[in-house]
Regions:
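Short hydrophobic interaction/assembly module
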Residues: 51-80
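Glycine-rich, proline-tolerant flexible connector loops at the mouths of alpha/beta enzymes
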Residues: 35-58, 107-112
């Protein structure tokens, strides 16, 4: 069974906050984990604070920085040198701030004309190529399948197969409730094929708009789990019933949530946790 100690915040929930205020928000909510990002305009991963300043902030607020989001297009061998250089940079930052993992996002483009077989083979090739960097920095790689139609890796089962083929223990999977709902897997398939031990983190959000699944976009992701069409609570129930006791990080992109004042945002997050615990 999950409790508040399992939950964390991805910085996308309040991208306008400076990093000190983001840490403070998580602390005031009595959460244990935060995820940083490298894609927030004008912010950088650490808002130009030094590694020592970031570590001090984390300690003061009783927080673990659990990941940096993300190394993009990690499974595109045509960009091998660029991807390796970016991973080295991310790994240097992660190691300096005591962050144990980097999220790996697959190529997601309508101009990707590789076959599914080629995309899988390239995923394996790149995971093998990048493993030495993760080993050197003692950082883990969390692979995040994306459910969008333009994605090159959409299934946690496929990601699991790639990890096993590579044979490197430093890789785990990001289970994202949004991408699971719009992707090819279902809970029955997970029950039969998925290895729960390969889950590194769960990304959690909800969708309430009246659209078809194919029309869902990141901007629709909120934390209203009462009216959630993703059925994220049911997805979490599956993990709870299979002894997952790891990190669950809120990752909503909805602008109306991001623009709430601090008091309203805290109320929404507390309400979301209340609606999810206990998971019945």
């Amino acid at each position: 069974m999950f409790n508040r100690s399992n939950f964390g915040l991805n910085r996308i929930i309040c991208p306008s906050y400076n990093i000190e205020d983001f840490f403070l928000l998580a602390n005031e909510l009595k959460l244990n984990y935060i995820e940083l990002r490298n894609d927030l305009p004008g912010k950088g991963m650490t808002d130009s604070l030094s590694a020592n300043e970031i570590k001090k902030l984390a300690k003061q607020n009783n927080l673990q920085i659990c990941s940096i989001n993300a190394l993009q297009r990690f499974n595109n061998p045509e960009e091998l040198r660029i991807i390796k250089d970016e991973l080295i940079h991310l790994s240097e930052v992660a190691k300096a701030i005591n962050c144990p993992a980097i999220i790996l996002c697959p190529a997601n483009s309508n101009s990707d004309f590789r076959s599914k077989k080629e995309q899988y083979q390239d995923t394996v090739i790149m995971l093998k190529e990048l493993a030495s960097i993760f080993t050197e920095y003692n950082i883990m790689g969390f692979i995040e399948p994306l459910g969008f139609k333009s994605r090159s890796l959409s299934s946690v089962i496929t990601a699991m197969g790639a990890i096993r083929e590579v044979g490197y223990e430093g890789y785990k999977i990001v289970f994202d409730t949004f991408h699971h709902a719009i992707g090819p897997d279902n809970l029955e398939k997970l029950r039969n094929e998925y290895d729960m031990n390969l889950t590194g983190i769960i990304h959690l959000s909800a969708v309430t708009v009246d659209l078809s699944t194919e029309e869902y976009k990141d901007e629709h992701r909120n934390i209203d789990f009462i009216n959630d069409k993703l059925k994220s609570k049911k997805q979490l129930e599956y993990f709870a019933n299979n002894d997952y006791n790891g990190i669950i990080s809120f990752e909503p992109f909805a602008r109306d949530l991001q623009e709430l004042n601090k008091g309203e945002l805290k109320n929404r997050i507390n309400m979301a946790i209340k609606n999810l615990i206990p998971i019945e």
